[in-house]
Swiss-Prot record:
Nucleotide-binding keyword on record: yes
Coiled coil stretches, renumbered: none
Organism: Aliivibrio fischeri (strain ATCC 700601 / ES114)
Name of the featured protein: Arginine--tRNA ligase
Family: Belongs to the class-I aminoacyl-tRNA synthetase family.
Known catalytic reactions: tRNA(Arg) + L-arginine + ATP = L-arginyl-tRNA(Arg) + AMP + diphosphate
CDD domains: Anticodon_Ia_Arg, ArgRS_core
């Protein structure tokens, strides 16, 4: 149950009954401090101002008609007109029982929408690098959350599998096949293959002529070129899949919807834009001038959709892409997890899409932009030599560092168990370090902080789960076979249950805002509340069996909530660390 939403509805009804205009926002929020209750209604002051009345007097009118029977034990007016709401122990205990009995932990499914999520999007014939990490793991966490809430989600891996560079790549692939008859080993180093192809193109005119010819042939459907192109795509995606699997990312080859997929749509779209009077000729190119965007001279900005040589641009592909996602995938929402530097480009493409009538305003097109991963020097994260860090190398180093850490802390574990723990902790650390940061900001990549067992980190959260689970293993009990009822008799118990009951609010916030850091923050706060509860409230050695059973239930619900929350982030838990 979303308690915040429930109270918000109740306060909204009371506002209207007290004389507020229909639809006035109740603005119910989680209270920042326990002294202000569990929730706070902040909408009274804004309504009172519009009505020209005293906020505290109006707040009292609202309280007089506010029906929170069976939900709140106390309500009070604070400051200039805030309403503080304290949940009752009986209500919280009842909600905790219901959540523990539900495999979804009380989280209701939402009305299903068709949602397309565009994320990861590496380029063909290039290895994934750290710049692909944020889109890949942020997108995947949001997708998992949306599916948990019951939505039909289409994963769209918009790989860069088209363009003039494929001429030189195909020409080089052909050269290698003729010389060695074997391709797979040469392509194991995709970056090297790409650099070699570019060097040949720049230095060997005969090779360059062949390469340019292959661009034309590929675009016209030549069988040999198509076969070579497919080989490049296949080899790239096999390598990418290794990274996805290591990171526990849910993308597969079936989710690939590359740039090439929209090729047949581009010419008809330009023709339609011309027919609608949106695209006009300018210096031989087809251009859409947008009043919404101005150039440095204050004139409408021109967006090229077809070059003078007949070639198309990324904007044209993005227009086709949005059109396809609405018309063929029946999208209600389309989420783009793309670097913040692409914002204007996307906005211009979507403006054209709306003007042309390809996607109605009822369909939400959302740019979930993200900042950059920076090194400790505050500059883009690079190798010591100043090069781009390969994602596979980053994951290898994470495993090496985690292995050393686990060796130091768990000398008595078997080699197999140490390896399993190290791999799980390493991948979790890389992901959580990123996911716990606000999506839109740049962040400093710091190995020491990532792998720390203190603070808002993956090792801390994984250990928090293990710690709770160990209560049951020590006692030889199953979390699913507990008896008795939840009874709240201590302030620490109440604080823990109140935080547990905010899980649905965190899930829904991630889904609506595309911000996984909200789940990380929630789980970290929950782990902190459990620590306070565990220190103050004896469980296994409690002499009162009813209290013991109740507290075991709270521990079980905590473990299940942490596990489910981390699962939505794509992070595995461990029963033993």
């Amino acid at each position: 149950m979303n308690i915040q939403s429930l109270i918000n509805d109740k306060v909204s009804q009371a506002l209207e009954a007290a004389g507020a205009p229909a639809g006035s926002p109740a603005a119910v929020r989680q209270s920042a401090k326990a002294q202000f209750g569990d929730y706070q209604a902040n909408g009274v002051m804004g309504v009172a101002k519009r009505l020209g009345t005293n906020p505290r007097e109006f707040a009292q009118k609202v309280l007089d008609v506010l029906d929170l029977d069976g939900i709140a034990s106390k309500t009070e007016i604070a400051g200039p007109g805030f309403i503080n709401i304290f949940l009752s122990e009986e209500f919280l205990a009842k909600q905790a029982e219901a959540a523990l009995a539900d495999e979804r932990l009380g989280v209701a499914k939402e009305e299903q929408q068709n949602i397309v999520a565009d994320y990861s999007a590496p380029n063909v014939a290039k290895e994934m690098h750290v710049g692909h990490l944020r889109s890949t793991i942020i997108g995947d966490a949001v997708v998992r959350t949306l599916e948990f809430l019951g939505h039909n989600v289409t994963r769209a891996n918009h790989i860069g599998d088209w363009g003039t560079q494929f001429g030189m790549l195909i020409a080089n692939l052909e050269r290698i096949q003729k010389e060695k008859g074997e391709v797979s080993m040469e392509l194991s180093d995709l970056e090297g293959f790409y650099r070699e192809s570019k060097k040949l193109y720049d230095e060997d005119e005969e090779f360059a002529v062949t390469a340019r010819g292959y661009v034309v042939k590929l675009q016209s459907g030549d069988e040999f070129c198509a076969e070579m192109w497919k080989k490049l795509v296949d080899v790239t995606m096999v390598q990418n899949q290794r990274n996805y699997d290591r990171l526990n990312v849910s993308l597969t080859r079936d989710n690939v919807m590359g740039e090439s997929m929209y090729n047949s749509m581009l010419a008809p779209i330009v023709a339609d834009l011309q027919k609608q009077g949106l695209a006009v000729e300018s210096e031989g190119a087809q251009v859409v001038f947008l009043d919404e965007y101005k150039n440095k001279d204050g004139e409408p900005m021109g967006v090229i959709v077809q070059k003078r040589d007949g070639g198309f641009l990324y904007t044209t592909t993005d227009i086709a892409c949005a059109k396809y996602r609405y018309e063929e995938l029946n999208a209600d929402r389309v989420l783009y997890f793309i670097d913040s530097r692409q914002h204007q480009h996307l906005m211009q493409a979507w403006t054209i899409v709306r003007k042309a009538g390809y996607v109605p305003e009822s369909v939400s097109l959302e740019h979930h932009a993200f900042g950059m991963m920076l090194g400790k020097d505050g500059r883009p994260f690079k190798t010591r030599a100043g090069g781009t860090v390969r994602l596979a190398d980053l994951l290898d180093e994470a495993e090496e560092r985690a292995t050393k850490l686990i060796e130091e802390k768990n000398k008595d574990l078997s080699a197999e168990e140490k390896a399993k723990i190290a791999t799980t902790v390493a991948m979790a650390a890389v992901k959580y370090s990123d996911l716990s940061k606000h999506r839109t900001t740049d962040y400093i990549f710091d190995w020491d902080n990532m792998l720390a067992f203190e603070g808002n980190t993956a090792p801390y959260m994984q250990y928090a789960y293990t710690r709770v689970a160990s209560i049951f293993s020590k006692a030889g009990l199953s979390m699913d076979e507990l008896t008795g009822e939840v009874k709240i008799t201590d302030e620490k118990e109440k604080a823990l249950v109140a935080k547990l009951m905010q899980f649905e609010e965190a899930v829904q916030a991630v889904a609506s805002e595309g911000q996984p850091h909200l789940m990380c923050a929630y789980l970290f706060e929950l782990a902190g509340q459990f620590s306070s509860f565990y220190e103050a409230c004896p469980i296994l050695n409690n002499e009162d069996d009813a209290v013991k059973q109740s507290r075991l239930k709270l521990a079980a619900l905590t473990a299940k909530t942490i596990k489910q929350g981390l699962e939505l982030l794509g992070i595995e838990t461990l029963e033993r660390m």
